Amino acid sequence: MRVLGIDPGLRNMGWGVIDVSGTRLAHVANGICHSDSGDLAHRLLSLHGQLTDVLARFQPDTAAVEHTFVNKDGVATLKLGQARGIALLVPAQAGLAVGEYAPNAVKKTVVGVGHAAKEQIQHMVRLHLPGVHLAGPDAADALAVAICHAHHVQSSGRLEAALARAAR
């Protein structure tokens, strides 16, 4: 299974692709979609195009997006929400199921602590994916989202299999 993780952002949208085979994880690629300053519509269009290119290039089977947090600046929160909309839309347009995870759930899954620092996330991503060269903190966060999604998909698959066996 190939998983695309996305860390939404208006200026820098991180993405990371991993392959999952049983309990084995393998890094495929990671990067950042950038949008320069300018009007919001063109920035969102740029992110849409870049993320569409990532999907076309790496052909993931499923995707996951991190929830955004609400900060004190309402305008910034709304803009971030619009970028998150692009992060949800592009994989959905490609016909993929899209998982969504709270930042604390991602950190808990990858680091073991729900309030981990960015450095801890990067360290654990490197441990889970040996040899990975991170394109930046946003790409590391996106890979962490992909790892979290892989873990949850595997867990739910095991649960469904156990329930099916129990129902026989």
UniProtKB/Swiss-Prot annotation:
Protein name as catalogued: Crossover junction endodeoxyribonuclease RuvC
Highest taxon of the lineage: Bacteria
Keyword hit for Protein biosynthesis: no
GO cellular component, one term: Holliday junction resolvase complex
Binding site for Mg(2+) 1: D7, D138
Database matches in SUPFAM superfamilies: Ribonuclease H-like
Reaction(s) the record says it catalyses: Endonucleolytic cleavage at a junction such as a reciprocal single-stranded crossover between two homologous DNA duplexes (Holliday junction)
Binding residues for Mg(2+) 2: E66
Similarity comment: Belongs to the RuvC family.
Gene3D superfamilies: Ribonuclease H-like superfamily/Ribonuclease H
NCBIfam families to which the protein is assigned, alphabetical: ruvC
Gene: ruvC
Entries under PROSITE patterns matching the protein: RUVC
Subunit composition and interactions: Homodimer which binds Holliday junction (HJ) DNA. The HJ becomes 2-fold symmetrical on binding to RuvC with unstacked arms; it has a different conformation from HJ DNA in complex with RuvA. In the full resolvosome a probable DNA-RuvA(4)-RuvB(12)-RuvC(2) complex forms which resolves the HJ.
Enzyme Commission (EC) number: 3.1.21.10
Function: The RuvA-RuvB-RuvC complex processes Holliday junction (HJ) DNA during genetic recombination and DNA repair. Endonuclease that resolves HJ intermediates. Cleaves cruciform DNA by making single-stranded nicks across the HJ at symmetrical positions within the homologous arms, yielding a 5'-phosphate and a 3'-hydroxyl group; requires a central core of homology in the junction. The consensus cleavage sequence is 5'-(A/T)TT(C/G)-3'. Cleavage occurs on the 3'-side of the TT dinucleotide at the point of strand exchange.
InterPro entries reported in the protein's UniProt record: RNaseH-like_sf, RNaseH_sf, X-over_junc_endoDNase_Mg_BS, X-over_junc_endoDNase_RuvC
Keywords (A to Z) from UniProt: Cytoplasm, DNA damage, DNA recombination, DNA repair, DNA-binding, Endonuclease, Hydrolase, Magnesium, Metal-binding, Nuclease
Species: Cereibacter sphaeroides (strain ATCC 17023 / DSM 158 / JCM 6121 / CCUG 31486 / LMG 2827 / NBRC 12203 / NCIMB 8253 / ATH 2.4.1.) (Rhodobacter sphaeroides)
One of the GO biological process terms: DNA repair
Family matches, as PANTHER family: CROSSOVER JUNCTION ENDODEOXYRIBONUCLEASE RUVC
